[in-house]
Amino acid sequence: MDLMDRPHLAWHLSGGTTELLLVEPDGRNVQCTRIGGTTDISAGQLIDRTGVLLGLPFPCGKHLDQLSQNAIEKDFFQVKCPAMEFSLSGVQNKVEQYRANHSPQETAAYALRCISYAIRQATTNALKEYPGLEVVFSGGVASNSMIRHDMRMLNAIFSKPEFSTDNAMGIAVLANRLREG
């Protein structure tokens, strides 16, 4: 919990949002400033849309993650991320095109590699502007094994996957800090 007492970066990766935040202590609370993320659809939306395209059960995150484990190809679309923001709607079109000539396993991995690349680029750019800060990953998409693997070199902090599925843990931590404070 001492992380809450020093500045850090935080990703909220879910079906509803993909935001990169600068988190700064403010007494027992924190101030969060959005500094990056998607400008359109969220990572979770792209994951679910890819899963539906592949006939997976909804919500698709866990199933897409499992399906991608057997992929061999390393193809991905390099999302443009000149600063800390990026668009994923074009990736959805690329995934649909990719699916026409590739297996479900390869398509699942392709979509996840595109998402992971964009997040990694935005994080790398943020660390240039805010050097030395740790990066916390939360939200359901943060339980994805490819994203967890790809972010390991970026001062990344992940909770256990079972605590990454919703925001209940974060709300509980903040409520406890305010109660104590």
Q: What are these language model-derived features?
A:
Residues S159-G181:
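Glycine-rich phosphate-binding/hydrolytic loop that grips phosphoryl groups
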Residues M1-L9, V173-R177:
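Conserved phosphate-binding catalytic cores of ATP/NTP-utilizing and phosphoryl-transfer enzymes
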Residues D48, N125, M169-G170:
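Hydrophobic side chains within alpha-helical segments
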Residues R6, W11-S14, T18-Q105, G181:
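A short helix-loop
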Residues Q66-V135, V141-F158, N176-E180:
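A contiguous, well-structured pocket-lining segment that forms one wall/lid of small-molecule binding clefts
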Residues M4, E24-R28, D150-M153, V173:
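Short, glycine/charged-enriched secondary-structure capping and boundary segments
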Residues W11-L13, D40-I41, V136-G139, S159-N167:
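Active-site nucleophile and cofactor-binding loops and adjacent substrate-binding regions
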Residues A43, I147, A168:
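Hydrophobic (often cysteine-bearing) scaffold residues that line and stabilize catalytic clefts
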